């Protein structure tokens, strides 16, 4: 058995937050109006080794996929049960499917989040296709409807699904947006809130042009969203501040959140703060200072510092 598995589980004395489990309307109100940001805890199989390495666990610490997923779940449970991870500054958390099905602090993860005032979301995409026409579309999601019903039964509020834009290809970006909104219709029909995530790579040489094409395609797609529905958008921080203002202020958009896209936290927060009305939905920028070797006190102090910095950048 790898050495790491002999370490004790990290535990915290659980305070009584007195926060009841939230119903859909309460979660909707929180996500739409409250101050805070959305934590992205949804690394999938392909990105898990990198996330574990950042956490201080090398690949030789596990030998099977199940051990790997067990380690990443322990990391996420440690975050979710840390005293600083509460609905005061964290609006929501995006979960990987296995995390949704697991437990934190002896409770199902969605329930544990709601008890802390944090709204649960679920990553539903199955990864990316190979690049074509400057973009990477989402792979097929054949069991989406069943997954949505299971998520809703567990108290999940919304979903997230990611595509990637590598070049300023008008036809490629139009295809990305169409696919995203087509899937969003299924999610809305299931009674869940879709987060639409067409990421523009920060490595793209024509990133600013991609931002503009994407904005205009999303504006066209929003015209077809019925008046009784809204969607959320998760976008790369634009190359030029204010590019997405029309999306932030659109009546069919509940909230626009930003991915860190490879920026370290100080730079991600500085860039985000230039875009009024955008809030963070960071993953690596949230987790980058956390290490499995830390004591409970050290871990929570590092997490609290990251939460405070990201919350402040989201409050502009």
Give a label for each model feature.
Residues 2, 67, 171:
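Short, surface-exposed alpha-helical recognition segments that flank or form part
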Residues 3-22:
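Short, Lys/Arg-enriched N-terminal segments with co-localized hydrophobic residues
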Residues 18-157, 165-167, 217-316:
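Alpha/beta catalytic barrel-like cores
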Residues 106, 173-177, 208-211, 293:
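Conserved strand-to-helix beginnings and helix N-cap segments that scaffold or border functional pockets
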Residues 122, 176-190, 211-226:
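Alpha-helix-loop-beta-strand connector modules within alpha/beta enzyme cores
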Residues 132-136, 159-174, 201-208:
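Surface-exposed cleft-lining segments at the edges of enzyme active sites
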Residues 152, 173-176, 193, 200-204, ...:
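Conserved mixed alpha/beta catalytic, RNA-binding, or beta-rich assembly cores of soluble enzyme
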Residues 157-163, 191-199, 234-235:
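Short beta-strand segments at enzyme active-site cores
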